[in-house]
């Protein structure tokens, strides 16, 4: 954890002490703790934020991500479905569901969720990248290459060097499999 993360967490903890009924300060604490890898504290902060503001989709999504990182998949899935009841067009929730299914090795389900995320946000590098991985896992090389090319194009357009490098590595691996 960086000093910056530590300072942010300490500032958020102090804000919680000063404003114990403010859902937003708990949300910020959850976010800071999640980024700092304090996942249990992040979950507690998000839970409190949601208790104070039950329709706070950002806090719910943060909790769903945290539960996924804690491998509490059923809890994460349940929260994702609650968010989608409030907002069926929340693309990041479909992406998170896709990640859950990837981590469980359920590639068909992962692809389905990533496709929903892609329908809502067609220029998302990470969704295309994950779809390429998913299609590769289910042995659909042509779709895998289609999505990795789209991911590479998006990364190129956005001057995302890390994305370009990741795309090239996966693209070369996919080509090697097709030989």
What do these predicted ranges mean?
Residues 23-24, 57-58, 91-92, 125-126, ...:
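Helix-start (N-cap) detector for alpha-helical repeat units in TPR-like alpha-solenoids
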Residues 35, 69-70, 103, 137, ...:
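Register position in tetratricopeptide repeats
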Residues 125, 129, 133-160, 169-172:
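TPR/TPR-like (Sel1-like) alpha-helical repeat modules
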